[in-house]
């Protein structure tokens, strides 16, 4: 029996490991969105090019050398975040193929910098002089460029006008002058153009494609990393809502996807699949550096690749029009088309650049254990017994209400990010979304805190255990642990520090990730104990006092900055919602029903049944409505567009309304009254508008797609965006509202039959009529239309009346004259001829009848 028991233990461990690997749904389908952080493989950014001021001239045309001045200004970053390297890209202007003229560069900066030069089409053997500020250096590209290039340090004037006059006095004239904030990349095109003015006069609104600085701003996004075994093939899905926050932008935008290794040293070899989706008209530009292997890019938009030097991978592209939107549909589409396993999904509301950083295969194999849920990893490590087997003291946290999104920003004093990480924005574009780690795996190393932890949660509480050895061996002995609420302090057993939080207390926040899933967030705060506490960790299960100051900033910053906060570790836990957790409301639209109808006239009386027929330059009248019980609940028409496709995910250029703002000049809104139902607390809100149809598609069947979204008339709502008018939406709508509207939208589609305009309209069948039109007889002569016939009949009537009147006038005047001339009834035969002549003469000349008589 002893032998049997001895062999049963590894068998049980193997079975438990198998259960861990196979329990639950397939890894490829378990994607619950959460705000991404720096550890996410895909980062969303907004790239912009701008300068502060500057000028350009052709004043150096007759001089032996060009003179280009760069006057850099400090950024708003703190002293510890100052940039120390700038890459200066030099290439000729468009009218010059290869630049041969000597150049002088004045590179003035408020701090010492390392200038990295990257040149294109600049002839070798040409003298070039670089004047830099004190302490700065210039690193030249490899080759013969450095043989004729010199660097000198100078003490420059700081003001623009003083520096410009100094350069003009020194060299006679200036080719270009550019003032800009320090940037990682500066692009200068050298050369002289005759269209430039003769002198350089600095202007604030200096806009030129020849002199630009590149700035990258991180953008908030949501995503997930799906757990899977390390594999040389990776599938990454990126969904972009809009490339620009400007609602009036209608130009095609280049979206750059930059692919590089996550670490510089090891070589990365991957077979990569990118599935890219954006409803807007964009051009995806793919660039890869220092990554070998094959890359396949799939998108419904146009796809391009970088230059030869920007294509380290073998790239192929495939344009597919059937790629859907939303996370669930995209994941299903990828699996149905054989693109598996899906590695990550990323959704960004606004961005024009994405950075994809790939891990080395060997490093991924070392972290293979991380694919197992964190709360169960301890079972695979026999050296560390389960920390949660020991009894815990009941939590002392005082619930604070458990408010849903947004949760307050976590101060990160002393946060030290690696140089390879993207700096976090001070105020994210989406205030309600913080850049947090992926919810599937707690961030073990973040903000300089290197500790091992595991998270376990149920439908009542969340428990996080921190390994004591890893905590103390990394130099945190004497520090203490709390949750966001400083009153929720850690307990300690023999091997772990344990922190426990109810789902609606200790600063825990939550948000809905899927219809039946909720993600809960909190943070471990590592800080120095208050002066009244003893140093070192107590033995047994003694509470760890957090001190008086739970967060930095409460005391003197100069004294407490090194010790008051060693760091913050963000952790989270996902739950399938079996019942409503405390303080969590149900679906916002559970009691709201949308509807959309099309009408023939602006009276909006009877909706058109079936397919709505429309001709060129005819109005389409649209009514959308919502039936709801909450009087503070409103709705908005987020987007309406016409498309030849029935799938609303396939965007077209015929946009009528975009983000509540009318895009078509013919859009007209109509007022409507709110209708109250006899049912208690039920009412219908309606919105009506019309637009003039223009036939831009060569097809007889079109589809009107409208996305409706819920909004709140009550200020301060955390669940829904504030209701705005179309006029306000055109000027004040930001990415925050767009992000929130996407979570509560409903799409309606109505078919439209395009009919041709003909002269014989009474013979053209129309679906607008409520009664069916019988087919015409087989042999019918199509004559004039009704209006023409009525016009002719009326004209004939008028002509007949005029003729009758004229005849009556003639008859009335000639009849009286004849009656006044009495002729004998039986004249003598001798007088007959004379009388007849007299009468004939009288009738022929009525004016002379009186004299004759």
Curated annotation (Swiss-Prot):
Positions modified as Phosphothreonine? Answer: 842
Q: Which Gene3D superfamilies match?
A: Zona pellucida, ZP-C domain, Zona pellucida, ZP-N domain
Q: What is this entry's stated membrane topology? A: Single-pass type I membrane protein
Q: Which residues lie on this side of the membrane: Cytoplasmic?
A: 812-853
Q: Where does this protein have compositionally biased stretches of type Low complexity? A: 838-853
Extracellular compartment residues: 24-789
Composition skew (Polar residues), residue ranges: 820-836
Q: What is its main location?
A: membrane
GO MF, one annotated term: PDZ domain binding
**Pfam families recorded for this chain?**
Zona_pellucida (PF00100), ZP-N (PF23344)
PTM info: Extensively modified by glycosaminoglycan groups (GAG). Phosphorylated in the cytoplasmic domain by the type II receptor TGFBR2 at THR-842 to mediate recruitment of ARRB2 and subsequent internalization of TGFBR2 and TGFBR3.
Q: Which residues cross the membrane?
A: 790-811
User: Listed disulfide bonds for this chain?
Assistant: 55-200, 640-706, 661-730, 711-723
Question: Residue ranges of region Disordered?
Answer: 530-559, 820-853
Q: This protein's superkingdom?
A: Eukaryota
- Which interval of the chain is the signal sequence? 1-23
Glycosylated residue positions = 37, 144, 493, 535, 546, 572, 591, 698
Question: Listed GO cellular component terms?
Answer: cell surface; collagen-containing extracellular matrix; cytoplasm; endoplasmic reticulum; external side of plasma membrane; extracellular space; inhibin-betaglycan-ActRII complex; membrane
Task: Give the residues annotated as coiled coil.
Answer: none
Q: What biological-process GO terms show up in the record?
A: animal organ regeneration; apoptotic process involved in morphogenesis; blastocyst development; blood vessel development; blood vessel remodeling; BMP signaling pathway; cardiac epithelial to mesenchymal transition; cardiac muscle cell proliferation
Annotated function? Cell surface receptor that regulates diverse cellular processes including cell proliferation, differentiation, migration, and apoptosis. Initiates BMP, inhibin, and TGF-beta signaling pathways by interacting with different ligands including TGFB1, BMP2, BMP5, BMP7 or GDF5. Alternatively, acts as a cell surface coreceptor for BMP ligands, serving to enhance ligand binding by differentially regulating BMPR1A/ALK3 and BMPR1B/ALK6 receptor trafficking. Promotes epithelial cell adhesion, focal adhesion formation and integrin signaling during epithelial cell spreading on fibronectin.
Q: How does it assemble?
A: Forms homodimers and homooligomers. Interacts with DYNLT4. Interacts with integrin ITGA5:ITGB1; this interaction promotes the internalization and trafficking of ITGA5:ITGB1 into endocytic vesicles. Interacts with TGFB1, BMP2, BMP5, BMP7 or GDF5 and inhibin A via the ligand binding domains. Interacts with ALK3/BMPR1A; this interaction results in the cell surface retention of BMPR1A. Interacts with ALK6/BMPR1B; this interaction enhances BMPR1B-mediated stimulation of the BMP signaling pathway.
What is this protein called in UniProt? Answer: Transforming growth factor beta receptor type 3
Q: Which organism is it from?
A: Rattus norvegicus (Rat)
């Amino acid at each position: 029996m002893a032998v049997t028991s001895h062999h049963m233990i590894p068998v049980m461990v193997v079975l438990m490991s198998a259960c861990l690997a196979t329990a639950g749904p397939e890894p490829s389908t378990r994607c619950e969105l959460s705000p991404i952080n720096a550890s996410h493989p895909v980062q969303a950014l907004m790239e912009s090019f701008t300068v502060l001021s500057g000028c350009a001239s052709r004043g150096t045309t007759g001089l032996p050398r060009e003179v280009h001045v760069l006057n850099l200004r400090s950024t708003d970053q703190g002293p510890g975040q100052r940039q120390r390297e700038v890459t200066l890209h030099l290439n000729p202007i468009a009218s010059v193929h290869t630049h041969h003229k000597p150049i002088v560069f004045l590179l003035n900066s408020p701090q010492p910098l390392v200038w990295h030069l990257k040149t294109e089409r600049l002839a070798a053997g040409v003298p070039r002089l670089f004047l830099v500020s004190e302490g700065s250096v210039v690193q030249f590209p490899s080759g013969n460029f450095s043989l004729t290039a010199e660097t000198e340090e100078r003490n420059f004037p700081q003001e623009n006008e003083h520096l410009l006059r100094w350069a003009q006095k020194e060299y006679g004239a200036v080719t270009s002058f550019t003032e800009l904030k320090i940037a990682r990349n500066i692009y200068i095109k050298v050369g002289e153009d005759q269209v430039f003015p003769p002198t350089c006069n600095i202007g604030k609104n200096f806009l030129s494609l020849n002199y630009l600085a590149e700035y990258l701003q991180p953008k908030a996004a949501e995503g997930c990393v799906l757990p899977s075994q390390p594999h040389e093939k990776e599938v990454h899905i990126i969904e972009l809502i809009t490339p620009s926050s400007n609602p009036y932008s209608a130009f095609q935008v280049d979206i750059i996807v930059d692919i590089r290794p996550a670490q510089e040293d090891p070589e990365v070899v991957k077979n990569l699949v990118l599935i890219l989706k954006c409803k807007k008209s964009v051009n995806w530009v793919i660039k890869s550096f220092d990554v070998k292997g094959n890359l396949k890019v799939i998108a419904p938009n146009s796809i391009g690749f970088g230059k030869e030097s920007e294509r380290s991978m073998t790239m192929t592209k495939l344009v597919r029009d059937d790629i859907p939107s939303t996370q669930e549909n995209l994941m299903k589409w990828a699996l149905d088309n054989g693109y598996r396993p899906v590695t990550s999904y990323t959704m960004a509301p606004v961005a024009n650049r994405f950075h994809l950083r790939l891990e080395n295969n060997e490093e991924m194999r070392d972290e293979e254990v991380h694919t197992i849920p964190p709360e169960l990893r301890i079972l695979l490590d026999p050296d560390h017994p389960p920390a949660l087997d020991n009894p815990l003291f009941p939590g002392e946290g005082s619930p604070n209400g458990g408010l849903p999104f947004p949760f307050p920003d976590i101060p990160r004093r002393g946060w030290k990010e690696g140089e390879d990480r993207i700096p976090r924005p001070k105020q994210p574009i989406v205030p309600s979304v913080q850049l947090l780690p992926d919810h599937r795996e707690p961030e073990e190393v973040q903000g300089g805190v290197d500790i091992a932890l595991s998270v376990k949660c149920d439908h009542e509480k969340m428990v996080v255990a921190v390994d004591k050895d890893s905590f103390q061996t990394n130099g945190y002995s004497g520090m203490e642990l709390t949750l966001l609420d400083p009153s929720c302090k850690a307990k300690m057993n023999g091997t772990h520090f344990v922190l426990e939080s109810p789902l609606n207390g200790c600063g825990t926040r939550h948000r809905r990730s899927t219809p039946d899933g909720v993600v809960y967030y909190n943070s471990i705060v590592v800080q120095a104990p208050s002066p009244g506490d003893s140093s070192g960790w107590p033995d047994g299960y003694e509470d760890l006092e957090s001190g008086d100051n739970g967060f930095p900033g409460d005391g003197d910053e100069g004294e407490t900055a090194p010790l008051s906060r060693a760091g913050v570790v963000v952790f989270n836990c996902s739950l399938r919602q079996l019942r409503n957790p405390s303080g969590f409301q149900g679906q916002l639209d559970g009691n709201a029903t949308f509807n959309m109808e099309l009408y023939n006239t602006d009276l909006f009386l009877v909706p058109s049944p079936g397919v709505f027929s429309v001709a060129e330059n005819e109005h389409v009248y649209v009514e959308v409505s919502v039936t709801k019980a909450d009087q503070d609940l409103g709705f908005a028409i987020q987007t309406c567009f016409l498309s030849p496709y029935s799938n609303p995910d396939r965007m077209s250029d015929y946009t009528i309304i975009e983000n509540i703002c009318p895009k078509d000049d013919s859009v007209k809104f109509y007022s409507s009254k709110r209708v109250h139902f006899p049912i208690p607390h039920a009412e219908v809100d309606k919105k009506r508008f019309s637009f003039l149809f223009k036939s831009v598609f060569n097809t007889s069947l079109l589809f009107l797609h409208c996305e409706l979204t819920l909004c709140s008339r009550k200020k301060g709502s955390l669940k829904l965006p504030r209701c705005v008018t179309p006029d306000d939406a055109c000027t004040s709508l930001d990415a925050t509202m767009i992000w929130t509207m996407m979570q509560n939208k409903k799409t309606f589609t109505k078919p439209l039959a395009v009919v041709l305009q003909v002269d014989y309209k009474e013979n053209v069948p129309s679906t607008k009529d409520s009664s069916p039109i019988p087919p015409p007889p087989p042999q019918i002569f199509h004559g004039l239309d009704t209006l023409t016939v009525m016009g002719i009949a009326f004209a004939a009537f008028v002509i007949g009346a005029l003729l009758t009147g004229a005849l009556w006038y003639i008859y009335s005047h000639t009849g009286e004259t004849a009656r006044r001339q009495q002729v004998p009834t039986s004249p003598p035969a001798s007088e007959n001829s004379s009388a007849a002549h007299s009468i004939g003469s009288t009738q022929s000349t009525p004016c002379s009848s009186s004299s004759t008589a």
